[in-house]
Structure formats: C-alpha cells, structure tokens
Amino acid sequence: MMTETVRTWRHIPQRYNLTGSKCLQCGNVFFPSRIICPECRRKGKLEELKFSGKGRIHSYSVINTPTDEFKDIAPYVVAIVELEEGARVTSQIVDCDPDSIEIGDEVEMVFRKVREEGEDGVISYGFKFKPKT
C-alpha cells in the first residue's frame, strides 16, 4: 500500500508538478516528459519544463455513466487541455457545471484529490483543471 503512494509522489513528479520537456533544437514541448524528441531524434537536446498550468479546452466529454470508483461525482467532465506552452494533457475539469463547458474555455490547474486507495484510505493527489475565474 505505502509503496504505491511513495512511487506516486516521489518517482512520478509530473503527477503533481505538471512538468514536461522541451526540445532545445526544434522547440516542441511534451507531456509527459520524453528523453528523445520524436522530431529531431538524437540531434535534439531536451530540458525539463515546468508548465504554467494555464490553457484552453481543446476537446471534452461529459461522463454520465462512470465506473464504480467515480459514481459519486458523476456527471463530470474529462477534457484534453492545450496548455499555453503547446502541450496537451488529459484531465478532469472541476468546480463547474458540466453543461457550461465549451471548447476554447480558459482553464487553470488546481491540485486535488484523485482517489483513495484500499481500506486504509490512503489518498493520492494530482492536478486537475478548473474554469479560469
């Protein structure tokens, strides 16, 4: 149980930091991080990039019939968010009426509970997005 929690927090920083990578040769940005640029291949040099957490909804879906794990929060929105830096991430959109979401809406990252694990109720946190206020 604790091993999974430690792995989530310590070994997968993009789960809570919204970090990716940027190719210094062609300028492409990636989420999650990559070690080789698919455009430049070995010629490209990648550096870590911390995203601003701001973006727009590129596409979305309202989930009305979720799995048992998420039935208490239905209906909810899952979207592809295009970040200001150009990378796209898939995330839940929170703090909104699902019927009010539209493609192109501005959103910003927030840090929220993602799930509870097992009988001990160990909570995992991560990024989600909410409409920009």
Swiss-Prot record:
The keyword Metal-binding applies. Functions as a scaffold to connect the acetoacetyl-CoA thiolase and HMG-CoA synthase (HMGCS) dimers in the channeling thiolase/HMGCS complex, which allows for efficient coupling of the endergonic thiolase reaction with the exergonic HMGCS reaction. The lineage of its organism: Archaea, Methanobacteriati, Methanobacteriota, Methanomada group, Methanobacteria. GO terms for molecular function: metal ion binding. It comes from the Archaea. Keywords: Metal-binding, Zinc. This is DUF35 domain-containing scaffold protein. InterPro entries: ChsH2_C, ChsH2_Znr, NA-bd_OB-fold, Thioester_dehydratase-like. Zn(2+) binds at residues 23, 26, 37, 40. Interacts with acetoacetyl-CoA thiolase and HMG-CoA synthase (HMGCS) that catalyzes the first and second step in the mevalonate pathway, respectively. It comes from Methanothermobacter thermautotrophicus (strain ATCC 29096 / DSM 1053 / JCM 10044 / NBRC 100330 / Delta H) (Methanobacterium thermoautotrophicum). Belongs to the scaffold protein DUF35 family. PANTHER family: BLR3430 PROTEIN.
